[in-house]
Amino acid sequence: MSKTIPLRPANEQFTDSQWQAVFDGDENILVSASAGSGKTTVLVRRVIEKVKSGVDIDRLLIVTYTEAAAREMKERIQVALQKAMNEEQDPERRRHFSRQIALLPTANISTLHAFCLTVIRRFYYLIDIDPVFRMLTDETETLLLKEDVWDALREQFYAENQEAFYQLTANFSNDRSDDGLTNLIFSFYEFAKANPDPEAWINGLTQAYEVGDQLGESKLFQTYLKPLAVETLQRTLQRYEEMVTLTEGEEKLQKIWYLAQNEKEQTKQFLQFLERNDLESAYNLTELLSFDRYPTVRAEELKPTAEQAKQLREQNKKALNDLKKQLFTLSPDAMKQVLKEATPIVQEMAHVGKQFMEAYGAEKRLKNLVDFNDLEHYTLAILAKNQADGWHASEASVYYREKFDEVLVDEYQDINQLQESILYWLRRPLSTEGNLFMVGDVKQSIYSFRLADPTLFIEKYNQYGQGKEGKRIILAENFRSRKDVLDFTNLVFSQLMDERVGQIAYDESAALVHGFDQFSEAADYSTELLIYEKKATESVEFPELQSPELLIEDKTEGELYVTALKIRELIDQNFLIYDKKLKTDRPITYQDIVLLTPTKKNNLTILDVFKSLEIPVQVNDAQNYFQATEIRTMIALLQLIDNPYQDIPLAAVLRSPIVGLKENELVLIRLANKETSYYEAFLTFNQKMEPTMEEAVVQEKTIRFAESLEKWREQARRNQISNLLWTIYRETAYLDYVGGLPVGKQRQANLYALVDRAAAYEKTTFRGLFQFVRFIEKMQEKDKDLAEPVVLSEENAVRVMTIHASKGLEFPVVFVLDMTKEFNVSDLNERYIFEENLGVGIRYLQPEERVMYDTLPFLAIKQVRLRKLLSEEMRKLYVALTRAEQKLFLVGSYKDQAAMWKEWLKVGDVETLVLPAENRLQSKSSLMNWVGMTLVRHQKADEYQQEVVVSNVPQVKKHPANFHIQWFNEEQLRAAIQQLQLPERQAEDLAEKAQLSADKINRGLARLSFNYPFEVATRTTSYQSVSEIKRVFDDPDNKEIGKIEVREDNTIQAQPLIVNRMIEGDLSKPKFLDTVQAPSAAEIGTATHYLLQLIDLSKQPSYEEVRAVQERLVENKLILPAIAEKMNLEQIVAFFDTALGKQLIQHHQTVRREQPFSMLIEAEELIQNYPETTQDDLLIHGIIDGYIELDNQCILYDYKTDHVKGTSPQAISEIVERYRGQMNLYRRALQEATHKEVSHVYLILLNGGVIIDMQTGNVVDFIK
């Protein structure tokens, strides 16, 4: 029962709920504190009131999520205690407060890890651990240690030659490496160790694979897969009902009505099978699933209705096809067989993973190392003891339960299961008065990568809300933001977040309530959506190569220019914000603005764009530390000191200011000895006895450097690396040198940080320069860049940080960038997925068929993880929006406005407050799509789009939120930038970025026009590519070469020789001079080859899988979106249904794709009319699209995406003649490389839809 709460004084600033959170007690309490609700203030006040009531500060355990939060908490408590003591008149109470201030430095206010360390230091004897250990805190050191242990253990397993281990390796690795198995074991370890009882978790891994005879009755299907399928089918039936209603009674729409009725009955039958758990019938139905052609409607007045019905039907087709792929790729019997065969692999995974866990633990104990995970497990082992009748509190647990009057936990939503177990043994049992006080906001739980478990918060939220085991207090008032920001956030999340996606209902108790009423209304503070239209981007024109224009390379730059221009507008127009410290309005400054990004990958682009528009920007976590010139130079020098026989580091150091050689001087060193390594050439050059005058100047520098290098190498063997670095800095004056460069203080800070990094490394278990270099290389390899050291923190600059980094902070104006970035669900496409409660789901590689199958646990865990992943994305959006105090901007990009509205209007007709789960659970969606779907139902959206169907749900239609949408294209950005008054330097930067000067081009053309006097030798180059040779067959007249015929014997019959360099004679027109940037056939062909190179041949590729590969290529900027749109994916998929395509899949292990080759051929052998007196060789270079290597033969194939005039015998004959020479060269090169006969040569015409046997010249198959 709760204790009596004192009445809140009239002048008290706290709200009723805050007051309750401060004083309520005698039972466990969960405070659900929304963003900006003052939870830290409440927590501090609660501590102070406890102290005022006579509780000593050291009888409280206060757990924070970060060390910074712990420091802030101590500081705020000290200030409050000092204030209380100063205001107190009673001498006894003043002494009490004074004593609390004295106790504060040693009070238990810390992270849970720090408290665990205290427990272990005190009770280490209970678990027989050496109390003298070192904390293993460096991620890279941890990774290297894991790799060393795993390498040794893996070799041991290989030596044992057990079939089970080889099968495990084969299932998760490929023919190039077993990195897949390494990653699996490391992930296994992380998930196992996050569990309170790792051994129990490991022992239960195979349970999910033991489903019995009735697959439909299994817990996995019933709990995780059936609800998804039923929900999808119910929503599909609703859409068919809408189709029927739309078309009913209209004779000209009767065919559509019948189609909707038939497909609705088919869907209803599907649903009935699932509800009866009849998976066999459901599977058989999906095998017969087909969709008739949609009827054509010619009546103009009915076309809008027909189109509306068609859109509903398209959504249904996608939903049913997706459901089939998700759940019914295998029959129930086949799935049971797969589970049976996959079980031994999971058993071996558990065995190997457990062995690694033990070996890694033994290695850490041997070296007296303890990591954060060990701290938690050791603490749990100290607090709880396992006896015959279960777990009981140990003497340590009893001690702490008696010691602490209250356990206060901040950021409780980020606790994991292991940490929850520790808290359980620290708090008092439920049979007594509760003493656990938890504060957090599950809507801000965004640390799943640290295995945080928000369900722990949610369970208590629901239980305590019903008065079970504790009390729930909700802090809804937001004292941070304007009502404009809060209304917009509430509008969005009332429609997005519920138990299904987000994991908690965004109801009235969760909604944000405006609590700060001091803001003025000096400007429009409505949320703005800034949309960059990619389609509007055209090639940049350069009239007479004199007028520099803005060149936007991709959507990222487009969005950043939109953002930068909006910031310039705010600054230039003196946009007013309310200053809470000054308590008045003032003009905005750069320092008031923050850019929130999903990741750090675009930070360097942000720096470039903002610099070009003269906007100061601070990106302290740019993750470009290793890319800084001064750091790259020093790392190259350290690599050289470790091993001088490294050409690239040697050249880098010689070219750097440390030695100061020029390019031509580097050439002199190479000429001293052309046959050996560059270092040996360097030594030879230094020993040259009679150098030329030029060589003598260089030699003076190189000899001096060689002496320094030898001295540093000697020092590295006997001194610490940090001392070595100081020696180098001092002797080269490099530290002073970089200080004189632009941003000199930052560069010096970077070099200081390298010394700190070296000093930290020397405290690890690794030693020596070689290991340090490996250490640094591993950091670079794993993208664990050293954070760029912060030089200035209070400068007037726009700040950039990730959404994760912004948590707990607030800013007057917030721009959320890259909002249309597609959700990253790549982890769900791996061969394994781990989950805290369900264990592991694997994809099973059938060894004979070499086909990968999704197991039932994989399908179930994939759905669970997808919901969790998208729920966290939704919570990240909540964190991002609630960082804004006064003005919020959301930035994204779409192809054009039509594409944007198409995405947003998918839910325009939904009549429920919360949007359907299927729309929110689209993995290929984005944050902006989510936001857009909530806005189109608001009456404000009608101002921007006439097709908007304003929702009849009153909470949406007339919501008080306000927003504006603005669109920008490249032309508008260009015009806006030209109007800016940029300093000369910035203008020059833009010009340099956008334009090549005319005189530079003309100088290049003049060089290309130079006539070399030895004409005969120039007529044939010594290097030819097969593609260049091939081009001359297309149109010889345009290539300035006579008619050429390549014979079967690989010789070329040419007309009188004009030019024997078989390439185009004209310089290609620069891309920036093009007025239209339509993709060329060559660009489409190159992109198609990229795609074909990456398609997984271990199984029959589907359209969706091929599309996914294409999307990855676009995302990684290997192909442009405009080119992707022109690629014929249907033909690519259809090719794999041909006999040749199936042959590639059947022999996928011996298929070689994109194989480069070089072949030396005598010129007179290739070109008959070549002068006999000239003995020259041609180096033929090419890339073979692919071949199948069989036991005694090879099958060569080549893709072509050329436009084909038809498939008539004459057209086919022309194609065969056009490519015969190229294919003959490929065939010869392949035979020489493999020493095997090439039995077949196939030309695959993807656009023509045929496959040609080049030896017979006949069409052998059709691509349909």
From Swiss-Prot:
Keywords: ATP-binding, DNA damage, DNA repair, DNA-binding, Exonuclease, Helicase, Hydrolase, Isomerase, Nuclease, Nucleotide-binding. ATP binds at A33, S34, A35, G36, S37, G38, K39, T40. One of its GO terms (molecular function) is 3'-5' DNA helicase activity. GO terms for biological process: double-strand break repair via homologous recombination. Its EC number is 3.1.-.-, 5.6.2.4. GO terms for cellular component: cytosol; DNA helicase complex. Coiled coil: none annotated. The keyword Transferase does not apply. It holds the Pfam family UvrD-helicase. Residues 12-482 form the UvrD-like helicase ATP-binding domain. NCBIfam families: addA_Gpos (TIGR02785). HAMAP family: AddA (MF_01451). Belongs to the helicase family. AddA subfamily. This is ATP-dependent helicase/nuclease subunit A. It comes from Enterococcus faecalis (strain ATCC 700802 / V583).
